[in-house]
């Protein structure tokens, strides 16, 4: 059975790295003749953490930290075998988590 669609989900803490990665994936897929939809920016997940500053008492003094997880979605319609091969050979940065589903 031939693959009719590839869905790629990207997650990263740095929005510049994820945008650069999405751009390279889209350029590679378009260069090989596939139809590309995206990158679609998905909602950013914000995790907030509150920590007591001092090691002893002073519970009134606290610090707040926030961790943003940026997400992008790319759909590749009618990928050719050349598209799949070029996506496998693509060199991607280490700070990006990639999920690939082929249907």
UniProtKB/Swiss-Prot annotation:
Native source species: Rubrobacter xylanophilus (strain DSM 9941 / JCM 11954 / NBRC 16129 / PRD-1)
Disulfide bridges in this chain: none
Keywords linked to the UniProt accession: Ribonucleoprotein, Ribosomal protein
Keyword Metal-binding attached: no
Function: Involved in the binding of tRNA to the ribosomes.
PANTHER family, alphabetized: 30S RIBOSOMAL PROTEIN S10 FAMILY MEMBER
GO biological process, one term: translation
Subunit: Part of the 30S ribosomal subunit.
One Gene Ontology cellular component annotation held by this UniProt entry: ribonucleoprotein complex
Superkingdom of origin: Bacteria
Family: Belongs to the universal ribosomal protein uS10 family.
InterPro entries: Ribosomal_uS10, Ribosomal_uS10_CS, Ribosomal_uS10_dom, Ribosomal_uS10_dom_sf
HAMAP family: Ribosomal_uS10 (MF_00508)
Keyword Ribonucleoprotein listed: yes
Protein name in the entry: Small ribosomal subunit protein uS10
Pfam family, any one: Ribosomal_S10
One GO MF term attached to the UniProt entry: structural constituent of ribosome
């Amino acid at each position: 059975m031939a693959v009719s669609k590839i869905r790629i989900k990207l997650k990263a803490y740095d929005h510049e790295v994820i945008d650069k990665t999405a751009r390279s994936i889209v350029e590679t897929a378009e260069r090989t003749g596939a139809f590309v939809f995206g990158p679609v920016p998905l909602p950013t997940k914000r995790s907030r953490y509150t920590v007591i500053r001092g090691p002893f008492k002073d519970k009134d003094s606290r610090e707040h930290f926030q961790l943003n997880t940026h997400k992008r979605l790319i759909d590749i319609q009618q990928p050719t075998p050349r598209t799949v091969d070029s996506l496998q050979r693509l060199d991607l940065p280490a700070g990006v988590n990639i999920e690939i589903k082929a249907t």
